Regions:
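Hydrophobic packing and interface segments
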Residues: 20-26, 51, 72-73, 91, ...
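Short beta-alpha junctions and helix-cap segments that line functional grooves
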Residues: 2, 62-63, 89, 106-107, ...
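C-terminal transmembrane helices and immediately adjacent loops/tails
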Residues: 122-332
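Secondary-structure transition/capping motifs at alpha-helix termini
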Residues: 6-13, 68-71, 94-97, 111-113, ...
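Cytosolic catalytic headpieces and adjacent flexible linkers of membrane translocases
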Residues: 1-65, 69, 76, 83, ...
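Acidic (Asp/Glu-rich) catalytic motifs at the cytosolic membrane interface
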Residues: 76, 80, 84, 103, ...
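Hydrophobic residues within well-ordered alpha-helices
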Residues: 2-5, 85-86, 133, 294
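Mg2+-dependent phosphoryl-transfer enzymes with acidic/Ser/Thr/Gly-rich catalytic loops
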Residues: 30, 81-144, 185, 189-193
Length: 332
């Protein structure tokens, strides 16, 4: 009855087959848990809706049984006797107001307001942070794959060094630094609380992320090399500047397309992450300053580009953006 009042289980109602909801609710008491072996408890723990009148040692046993079934377990508690189960759980949650010092020390998280709804908000925040870390790592690695390919393959095509060390450092500062800041505060995915917990053994590049990172990096490198080669073999002196600038534009558009794994930027809205939008504009402005301010262009050893050349470099970024957006559509 208490579980129904708290909303843990539904109120009694008719169910298919003539059973009522009360008979479909499975509960275990501490006495029943005591009579079960660990293997028996493990076999039934997934089916139990309510655990009632359990002692601290029973809580520990329940946590261990759930973990043995491969679940990620969060345990709440406020007393000294809850400490073993709090410590054993993947996430121990202690009460900040009613909790004892021992329970707080044994926990990973403390609810300052003793409100269980705060746990849901904390889970969402944690998943969002993890998602954003994955997005940034994939974005950064893909961009670096592109730059490495440019540096490694260009000499085999009969060209001098395509990028100077200072230019590489500048690109990394703009992309990993400024764009990374914007990606770090991305909003949560729409389905973030409908997903199953991430497995502790799952890597950053799992679920196809590694494959996507590689092909995006190869695409960036191939586009920059193709553009630079066209300008080089047609005798254009600004071929290095075209590689340098196209890489900057491609990573700006790559960052915008990397905001969500499923949703299009047009659905999200550019200004739904104002920091990233601002950083993208800042990166473009800084890159243009390097091209057109004589002191900076001399320092970075680049040549000013014509309007046509600048649009050509920007079109490489638009191409990367279009391909990444189309991939999301086909995945759906």
């Amino acid at each position: 009855e208490i579980a129904r009042q708290l909303g843990i289980v539904s109120a009694p109602a008719a169910v298919p087959g003539g059973e009522d909801a009360a008979s479909s609710i499975k509960a275990l008491t501490g006495v029943e848990i005591e009579s079960l072996s660990f293997d028996e408890l493990k076999n039934v723990v997934d089916e139990v809706n309510v655990f009632a009148r359990v002692a601290p040692e029973h809580k520990l046993k329940i946590v261990q049984a759930l973990q043995a079934k491969g679940h990620i377990v969060a345990m709440t508690g406020d007393g000294v006797n809850d400490a073993p189960a709090l410590r054993k759980a993947d996430i121990g949650v202690a009460m900040g107001i009613a909790g004892t010092d021992v329970s707080k020390e044994a926990s990973d998280m403390v609810l300052l307001d003793d409100n269980f709804a705060t746990i849901v908000a904390a889970v969402q925040e944690g998943r969002t942070i993890y998602d954003n870390i994955r997005k940034f790592v994939r974005f950064s690695v893909a961009g670096n794959i592109g730059k490495v390919l440019v540096m490694l393959i260009a000499p085999f095509l009969g060209k001098p060094l395509p990028l100077l060390p200072l230019q590489l450092l500048w690109l990394n500062l703009l992309t990993d630094g400024l764009l990374g800041l914007g990606m770090g505060v991305e909003n949560p995915e729409p389905d973030i609380m409908k997903r199953k917990p991430t497995s502790p053994t799952e890597g950053v590049f799992s679920r196809g992320a590694g494959t996507q990172t590689i092909w995006v990096g190869v695409m960036i490198g191939a586009l920059a090399l193709s553009l630079g080669s066209w300008y080089y073999f047609t005798g254009r002196p600004e071929w290095q500047t075209m590689i340098f600038t196209s890489l900057a534009f491609m990573q700006v558009f790559q960052a915008l397309a990397s905001r969500s794994n499923k949703e299009s930027l047009f659905k999200l809205g550019v200004m739904s992450n104002p920091l990233l939008a601002g950083m993208a504009l800042l990166v473009v402005a800084l890159q243009l300053a390097v091209l057109y301010f004589p002191v900076l262009s001399k320092f970075f050893e680049v040549l000013p580009l014509s309007g046509y050349d600048l649009m050509t470099a920007a079109s490489m970024g638009l191409f990367v953006f279009a391909v990444m957006e189309l991939e999301k559509k086909f995945k759906k």
